[in-house]
Swiss-Prot record:
This is Thioredoxin F-type, chloroplastic. The active site is at C114 (nucleophile), C117 (nucleophile). Residues 1-77 form a transit peptide. It comes from Spinacia oleracea (Spinach). The record marks G115, P116 as: Contributes to redox potential value.
Length: 190
């Protein structure tokens, strides 16, 4: 199943020109000759978050950008949304970490009843908006995710795990914003 979208400035401003147009005069960036065509192979929503795998992303000849995605359930690799905090569970965490490749991944391990966790949440969301080269995840350490929390060695909440290339490279325990920021910057530069 493939969904082809061609977007242009004209199609966004004029209802007479639908965004599904494949007319090259309407699917290019005005004055540049560059195409805005994107091909999608599939997607899914997990816990209300749009999650995808990019199989191939490269700049094509003439400026065309092509991205393809596969159904992201089961053992398929997944990718979190950049610039947002993505909530994960025991089933979605490792596939997202694997899909991140060499990008740093920061995991906020929290509980609903934890006061310091609630205090850190807005700061953590701002970090996600600021550091677009880092994947920000959060894991509710409830009964359902207990096995993953144990696997990651949680002892206190909040705990922030910093991962890179499928391995934990840093940890910050407690609501220590400055230490978290240092750990993120260290992971980005390594």
């Amino acid at each position: 199943m493939a969904l082809h979208l061609s977007l242009s400035h004209q199609s966004w401003t004029s209802p007479a020109h639908p965004i599904t147009s494949s007319d090259p005069t309407r699917s290019s960036v005005p004055g540049t000759g560059l195409s805005r065509r994107v091909d999608f192979l599939g997607s899914c929503k997990i816990n209300g978050v749009f999650v995808v795998k990019r199989k191939d992303r490269r700049r094509m000849r003439g400026g065309e950008v092509r991205a393809s995605m596969e159904q992201a359930l089961g053992t398929q690799e997944m990718e979190a949304i950049v610039g947002k905090v993505t909530e994960v569970n025991k089933d979605t965490f490792w596939p997202i970490v694997k899909a991140a490749g060499d990008k740093p991944v920061v995991l906020d391990m929290f509980t609903q009843w934890c006061g310091p966790c609630k205090a850190m949440a807005p700061k953590y969301e701002k970090l996600a908006e600021e550091y677009l080269d880092v994947i920000f995840l959060k894991l509710d350490c409830n009964q359902e995710n207990k096995t993953l929390a144990k696997e990651l060695g949680i002892r206190v909440v909040p705990t922030f795990k910093i991962l890179k290339e499928n391995s934990v490279v840093g940890e910050v325990t407690g609501a220590k914003y400055d230490k978290l920021l240092e750990a993120i910057q260290a992971a980005r530069s390594s």
